[in-house]
Amino acid sequence: MKLKNIAKASLALGILTTGMITTTAQPVKASTLEVRSQATQDLSEYYNRPFFEYTNQSGYKEEGKVTFTPNYQLIDVTLTGNEKQNFGEDISNVDIFVVRENSDRSGNTASIGGITKTNGSNYIDKVKDVNLIITKNIDSVTSTSTSSTYTINKEEISLKELDFKLRKHLIDKHNLYKTEPKDSKIRITMKDGGFYTFELNKKLQTHRMGDVIDGRNIEKIEVNL
């Protein structure tokens, strides 16, 4: 066997048996070779998409969708949950949180949920700050925890907006989706003890994107990475 073929065979064997290539000249850290699943790559792509916020909008409802035209931009928002019953044909004084779901090149934007009532009171800067606690598991027995404030700007806020913005914060500041999220979760605890959970190994379920909670009653937000 030619030396060239021997080298190729040896290289292939090394990959099969060790799962990575090593070299004495320039060792490679295992972390740089970790392969993310397609599902995790898809989550990273989705939660890195641009989002758009529009306040005090009016629209009309037809066949399970609400059409808005902010700044002459056509936006169709699909209603998925309880908001189907909450809105009549003509809708006004609402805010919309938009993440584009369609991939075609048309000028129209399709989004899901994210409709809330416009604030009834005027606020200086924010509605409230809540405690954001982020715990990272180092190994099976060791973890680190940090605490900071998270600003809520709406009296009513959709689970879609909370989920999307929190994950974007974790992507930007804590490397979410650089590795597999496994059992990572976000937990939103309310003043009455109720809570909402976002599982970070999957996209927020479509039927929850239209659900709305009172931002003034959020007690704390906990993240386990």
From Swiss-Prot:
Lineage: superkingdom: Bacteria
Entry keyword Ribosomal protein: no
GO cellular component, one term: extracellular region
Intrachain S-S bonds: none
Signal peptide: 1-30
Matches recorded under InterPro entries: Enterotoxin, SSL_OB, Staph/Strept_toxin_CS, Staph_exotoxin, SuperAg_toxin_C, Superantigen_bac, Toxin_b-grasp_Staph/Strep
Matches recorded under Pfam families: SSL_OB, Stap_Strp_tox_C
SUPFAM superfamilies, A to Z: Bacterial enterotoxins, Superantigen toxins, C-terminal domain
Location in the cell: Secreted
Spans annotated as Sialyl Lewis X-binding: 94-196
Keywords: Secreted, Signal, Virulence
Record carries keyword DNA repair: no
UniProt similarity note: Belongs to the staphylococcal/streptococcal toxin family.
Assembly: Homodimer (via its C-terminal domain). Interacts with host FCAR and SELPLG (via sialyl Lewis X).
Domain notes: The C-terminal domain contains a V-shape binding site for sialyl Lewis X.
Purpose: Secreted protein that plays a role in the inhibition of host immune system. Targets myeloid cells such as monocytes or granulocytes through binding with sialyllactosamine-containing glycoproteins. Prevents initial rolling of neutrophils toward the site of infection by interacting with host SELPLG. Disrupts neutrophil motility by induction of cell adhesion via interacting with glycans but independently of SELPLG.
Name of the protein this chain belongs to: Staphylococcal superantigen-like 11
Gene (UniProt): sl11
